[in-house]
Amino acid sequence: MFFMNFKYHWFIYFLITIFVLMMNSNNIFIQWMLMEFGTIISISLINIKSTNKTPSLIYYSVSVISSIFLFFMIIVYLSSISFTKTDTFNFMVQMMFFLKIGTFPFHFWMIYSYEMMNWKQIFLMSTLIKFIPIYMMVSMTKINSWTLYFLITNSLYISFYANKFYTLKKLLACSTIFNSFYFIFILELNKNMFIAMIILYSFNYFLLISFLNKFNIQNFNFMFYNKYQMYTFLTLMFNYSMYPIFLSFVIKWNLIFMMVSVKAYNWILFLLMISSMLMIWNYIIILKRVFLKMNFYKNNFIDDKDNKYMYHSYFALTLLSFNISFFITLNFL
């Protein structure tokens, strides 16, 4: 058990190191090699402590297909052929990256895999394993109007598509696919803001996943032990959904500010706001069920004075105060 934990944590450190090296390299071929090393480590991480090997096989198959095409495209790219300067070649390369990160229309494999993964695997798939190909895609290709059309279509489609699922894992899979637009577009506009976003996003996502993993929450039929545990879940969900007054909303707010300053992005901003409201509505549906269950089962809650879950109230209050304080500091002072 100790060896498994040691190997698991070292693989994560290797993956972080690969991502840092990629951000400090301008050579496309070196970035591709680092991405492939990251893929090997990612498959190992998905397999560790997992009895179900299907998600790793799916991810391996998708990675092999995209990597083979990317390898030949990189060779053509480095040969300086005039075809590589065209929008067609640019879009073909981007489609291979979209396949790897599971965006529309290649989203089915990711949503299907999330249902079979545990929470630790979902955290890795939604953060480190996703950031590496996104960074290389923005480094290698040009984010033009066709890319923006495709990304905004992905956001609108996923925000509607997520409404049909009744499992928490599939909803988080759709949420991860939806957030791909933010990662790609922010990286294109401002690299420093992208780094700040992935750190904040990973931290918030880690808190949410740790909570779900600790209490073994798998679907919408969960029941909380007390109201403080429920308040913690509500705070984590609002924070993850980038809801106003929470620190995570600052990233979305800054992106909106940058898009408003460029009039060419106004139509994208309008569609993004619509898709964002639809996605937040999907989160609110979860919270509505939590409130309904709270009212129905409130008599079954454990006595607050005698239970060991009292610390959740302090955690929720601290997290909420921290978010509001930083939100006010960064935007009004």
From Swiss-Prot:
PANTHER family: NADH-UBIQUINONE OXIDOREDUCTASE CHAIN 2. Belongs to the complex I subunit 2 family. The lineage of its organism: Eukaryota, Metazoa, Ecdysozoa, Arthropoda, Hexapoda. GO terms for molecular function: NADH dehydrogenase (ubiquinone) activity. The gene is ND2. It is a multi-pass membrane protein. Changing residue 62 to M: In haplotype 9. Changing residue 84 to I: In haplotypes 3, 5, 6, 7 and 10. The chain crosses the membrane at residues 10-30, 57-77, 91-111, 121-141, 143-163, 170-190, 192-212, 242-262, 267-287, 313-333. It catalyses: a ubiquinone + NADH + 5 H(+)(in) = a ubiquinol + NAD(+) + 4 H(+)(out). Its main location: mitochondrion. Changing residue 138 to I: In haplotype 4, MELLI1 and MELLI2. Keywords: Electron transport, Membrane, Mitochondrion, Mitochondrion inner membrane, NAD, Respiratory chain, Translocase, Transmembrane, Transmembrane helix, Transport, Ubiquinone. This is NADH-ubiquinone oxidoreductase chain 2. One of its GO terms (biological process) is mitochondrial electron transport, NADH to ubiquinone. Its EC number is 7.1.1.2. The keyword rRNA processing does not apply. It is found in: Mitochondrion inner membrane. Core subunit of the mitochondrial membrane respiratory chain NADH dehydrogenase (Complex I) that is believed to belong to the minimal assembly required for catalysis. Complex I functions in the transfer of electrons from NADH to the respiratory chain. The immediate electron acceptor for the enzyme is believed to be ubiquinone. It comes from the Eukaryota. Changing residue 158 to T: In strain: MELLI1. One of its GO terms (cellular component) is mitochondrial inner membrane. It comes from Apis mellifera ligustica. It is an enzyme of class 7 (translocase).
